[in-house]
Amino acid sequence: NVDYRAPRLLSAERLAGAADEVATMQGTSRARRVCELMLEGSASPMETVPGLMLTLPVDFGGYGLEKPQLNHSIDVLAYRGSLSDWDAVTPDFLWAAHGVVLEYDSVKFHATRGTTQLERDAVRANTLTALGYRTFRATVQTLGTLPGLALLARQLAHALGTELEPTTPLQDLRRRKLYLQLMPKVRNLTGGNSILINTL
């Protein structure tokens, strides 16, 4: 078993600082670029995968969406007892300035935590919706095909008030390649549940 809630060892800021300290060495500019593209706060690999696909630049194979905050706590204490049972809720992906949330429904996580976790997730989603957040859901099936992921990206782009950048054939090829590199791990991350990887 893996505990994805373990404290992180290094932040993007600290890694960028280390690269700045050895600025004359080979590879530091690439390290700084990686820091700019990193998503911090992921609670599992299957949050990282859609996060990268959705936010990496189109030239890198992503959809180029604005980076969200991952697992960022929202204070809802003022609504406790009326719209919420909690002091805070923590969505998987949060675009706070746009009031948009994306929740990843993990088969493995829910299988190990049972219906209680499903109920908590439903209450959290309802709380966020009641507070005016536009709440989107992603499942293993949603992410299991590139067309499914593309639809989710278009829906999120619309909610964020933007349009996806048109792609060239080369960028489409890079997107399929990135998807295939990230998604083969999905069988291990879903508790052995096999899903179809379809890039058509």
Regions found by a protein language model. Give the residues of each.
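Surface segments flanking catalytic/ligand-binding clefts of nucleic-acid enzymes
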Residues: 2-200
